[in-house]
Amino acid sequence: MAGAGLIGIRRRIKSVTNIRKITKAMGLVSTAKLRKARLNLEINKKYYNEYKVILKDIINFIEDSNIYIDGNGSHKKLYVIFTSDSGLCGSFNINIINNVINEIKEDKENSLVIVIGQKGRMYLKKLGINTLAEYIEIPDVPTTKEARTIAKNIIKLYSSKEVGEVFLVYSEFYSPVKQQVLINKILPFTKENKSDNKYIEFNPPVTRFVDEILENYLKATILNCFSNSKASENGSRMTAMNGATDNANDLLDNLDLQFNRLRQSAITQEISEIVGGAEAQR
């Protein structure tokens, strides 16, 4: 009986050891990817923050009517959701999806969705939520090519009045163990009161290149979301894999203890049988 138990435990030890090898390797890969993603995030964040300041000044000095500032009259809301293509990253994707569900459940008829990432597409399909567009297989270091494609689609939907408000839903990266899901409204822009002591002269007039400025700003914003999302994804995956490796180590310790106890019990039983047999022959 003890022999059968020993065989079963030995199989479990082998299985858990193999799993630990996988989780440890994935943790190391995620650590390397996170380092790269954080560097990319820092570079993009500087560019994005500078562009935000410039755009704010430009918008405040636009006096003519403009749909990107005044709105286009549509009641439809567009949510652009940033998720991952791969899994095994803890609650990274489900937290984003849950935030979207809570946001659109009050007004489903006027809510439209663009999803980025295989996992987001899979979750939305299960929930029966249709999408306007899907973008998958985004590289580990997103480029302006991906950002431009999405930005142009957003501008097309907004300028044609198919949507009246645009929100970006993504995970803001703070540290490997802390990320926060944000829902940021990017269209229409919010105009602030002009500062009394500030004047900027534009040549040519700003109205001539507002569309180009808008597209560049949206590209920078989407690239910033991509950078935060990739860093958050890899941080979540690294934390999840390190946690899985620690759990595997704890399980192996318990299995080793069980194995040694059973083996000791089997040896004791065998000795008792030998002694008992010898006593019976006297």
Swiss-Prot record:
Keyword Membrane part of the UniProt annotation? yes
**Membrane topology per record:** Peripheral membrane protein
- Keyword Ribosomal protein carried by entry: no
**A cellular component annotation (GO) from this entry:** proton-transporting ATP synthase complex
Give the location in the cell: Cell membrane
Transmembrane segments in this chain: where? Answer: none
Alphabetized, the UniProt keywords read: ATP synthesis, Cell membrane, CF(1), Hydrogen ion transport, Ion transport, Membrane, Transport
Q: What is its main location?
A: membrane
SUPFAM superfamilies membership: ATP synthase (F1-ATPase), gamma subunit
Any one Gene Ontology biological process term? proton motive force-driven plasma membrane ATP synthesis
Which GO MF terms are attached to this record?
ATP binding; proton-transporting ATP synthase activity, rotational mechanism
What does the record give as the function of this protein? Produces ATP from ADP in the presence of a proton gradient across the membrane. The gamma chain is believed to be important in regulating ATPase activity and the flow of protons through the CF(0) complex.
What family does this chain come from, according to its entry? Answer: Belongs to the ATPase gamma chain family.
**NCBIfam families for this protein:** ATPsyn_F1gamma
State the oligomer form and interacting partners.
F-type ATPases have 2 components, CF(1) - the catalytic core - and CF(0) - the membrane proton channel. CF(1) has five subunits: alpha(3), beta(3), gamma(1), delta(1), epsilon(1). CF(0) has three main subunits: a, b and c.
Name by which UniProt lists this protein? ATP synthase gamma chain
- Organism of origin is Clostridium botulinum (strain Loch Maree / Type A3)
